[in-house]
Each structure stands twice: as C-alpha cells, then as structure tokens.
Amino acid sequence: LNIQLLSSNILNAVKFKLLLPETRANLNEVLGALVLRKLDFISPETFQVQTNINGVDSLMLFQEDARKELLERNKRREGPLFEGDESLLWSYEKFGNHILANQVLSRVTNTNWFLKGKNSEAITLASYERLQSAFLQSAVTYEKGGSIITKPNQQSDKVFEDFFFIMSAMNGAHGLTMANRKFYFNSFSDSFEPIYYDGDLNFLRTSNVDEMILRNAFRKDYKFSYHAEFA
C-alpha cells in the first residue's frame, strides 16, 4: 500500500509504503536497511508495525519513500533523486524483463526540487547527464563481460563497489539491477550516492549473485572499506 498523510507524520515521513512482510523477507529487510544506514549508506526507515486496514488487523512493514525526509534523516541536504526507468522493460513484450533489467536509463523522481529555481535546474540537468552516461557505459561493459557496477563518480571513488559488496553479502541481487537502482546526487561533494530500496535481502539463503558477475565486478585491489565498523 502506498500511503500519503495529509496531516501529521510518522517519524517525519509523510509518504511511505505498508508492505506484506513475506514480500520483503520480513525482518531480513528491517535488519538489512539498518545495517546499510549504520554503514552510512542512504537507507529508508523500515520497521514492523501493527495495522488495522478496513477492519482487518495485520502485521506490516513500514518503509518510507525516497523523498526529502529520507535525505534529512540520513543527514543529506535535499538534491536530485534518480531511479532506473523501467518503462523500457514493458515496451518490448518479446523480451523477458530479466533480459532488459540492465539495459535501462535513469529518470528524475523529485521534479519539485528541479522546479525550485535555476540553480536546482542546472544541478539536476548536469547530474542527470552524468548518470545517463554512466548507465550507458555500464550496459556496454556488462554486455562485454565486464563489471556490472554502475560508476557515475570518479574511478577512485569506491562507494558503489562498497554498496555492491554489502548488498551481495546480504543476497540483495534484486536491488543491484539497473532497473531497480536509486541514486542521490550530492552537490556539495559533486558525487552520486546509492540509495537502498527493494533489495529482496535474505541473510539465511545461499548466495543468489552469479559467480561470474562477482568475479568481474571488482577491481583486483578492491578492499571493503567498512570492516572496522563490525570489528
């Protein structure tokens, strides 16, 4: 269920989803979102909540939408938000969605911020161009058997490799396809950051990330940056 509160808020969120726990592996989603936030990735407030909908009591998962409030909660200033544009997936019926899942471009999701003024327009358009270029490069590289990781920042920036690593460790392959990705552009650091959403995380099952993809995903000298957090 997509919910919008016309008055008041829940933990500052006015737009959020109520999800059936089994569609997000229940507490796996709650724990995964918390782990990512503790590692300073942008991650939505997610928790179990008792609800009464049309007279039916049920346990649901609360998850806030990717909006201004999500950025503020994660100590980021409001800026351009993007996601994979899934329209291509539904345009070619003879192809299965999984075939085109990494052959998409991005789209802006917070158009209200874009319309605030000339500065926000310029920042959004410039970052949009950079992200589109990264999506195209990622699609070409992946088709040639290279890394599947989309890298819209400088090559020395490891944030997207780190995100791919921790998502893979939590069996979140679903959230790594380009069609399911969300991004925030930080104008102060002039760089993109990944936003966690819909990873289909599961800490108990066997890895669902293709071994060949893992083998080609990282640079040879890659090391996960955040191991000290859990030492």
Model segments located where?
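Compositionally biased P/S/T/G-rich terminal and signal peptide-adjacent segments
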Residues: 1-13
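Solvent-exposed loop/turn segments at secondary-structure junctions
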Residues: 8-10, 23-25, 56-58, 67-69, ...
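A conserved hydrophobic secondary-structure block that centers on an alpha-helix together
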Residues: 10-58, 126-159
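Sec-exported extracytoplasmic/periplasmic mature domains
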Residues: 36-41, 165-171
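A short glycine-rich, hydrophobically flanked beta-strand micro-motif that places a catalytic Asp/Glu
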Residues: 44-50, 177-184
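ATP-dependent phospho-/nucleotidyl transfer catalytic cores
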Residues: 67-169
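C-terminal catalytic region of ATP-dependent kinase domains
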Residues: 117-125, 129-150, 158, 171-172, ...
